[in-house]
């Protein structure tokens, strides 16, 4: 059984006056609802637990789960003081017998079933996997406003969610982190510190995390472009193409489309005695008429 924990307990301070980012409405629908839709439709996910602030539980149950018909939602639970605590609360609320879990940020609404499948497949090897993309920009180490080093970009990947783990492995990682008073930046870091090899599944640059007001117009644009369909098409290029951020597959598709000849309708023969709509009947010369047979088989003299 595969369960998903959708983490949306953050206060969204960087979102400013817009309020908690996971509940901001785009085209009349909360961001968290777009995210849940993907997991609701995915045949890979059996059930979900949503983690939100305590004072938002009833609103989420009524205005999100009930309004949008989320049948896979098993529970809506409150989050903790940190993301790590929130994930732990979500893990405890999953159905008994859950063997694998997918952790996902509620504010990454441009996730796709393809990414969920990819991270689940990658986690089969060691019990742990994340989605990530290669760094595109040069990364600097800075101290007190001064560059103290330049990182090798070829070795750097930007971690995303969804992340997938064997349930018992992730519970063990979280339990040990609490005992050791360790605060991890993501679930993979907790798995790493107990010696787990965490695999990487190629993510998507479109799988953005909505953290500030500047991200909202970007999501609105993606929404207008039907980004989920385009994302599924793009990531289906496979790890090599996606790792390069390669869009040549789309370009080739457009070229094939341009080269494709338009369908020609076959010309219909006009019936006897009727001319084509765009043509006047041709006047036949008397010599042509002599001895000719009309289409109706009557001989003319």
Where are these regions (language model features)?
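Residue-level signal for inorganic ion chemistry
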Residues: 6, 32, 90, 104-105, ...
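Short aromatic/basic micro-patch
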Residues: 25, 110, 150, 164, ...
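Conserved alpha/beta core of the MobA/IspD/sugar-nucleotide pyrophosphorylase nucleotidyltransferase superfamily
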Residues: 157-246, 250, 257-258, 263, ...
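A recurrent flexible, glycine/aromatic-enriched loop bordering the glycosyltransferase active site
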Residues: 149-159
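N-terminal glycine-rich phosphate-binding loop and ensuing alpha1 helix
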Residues: 1-58
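Conserved beta-loop-beta/alpha segment of the NTase-like Rossmann-fold superfamily
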Residues: 73-75, 81-144, 160
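Conserved N-terminal catalytic core of the sugar/cofactor nucleotidyltransferase
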Residues: 33-98, 178
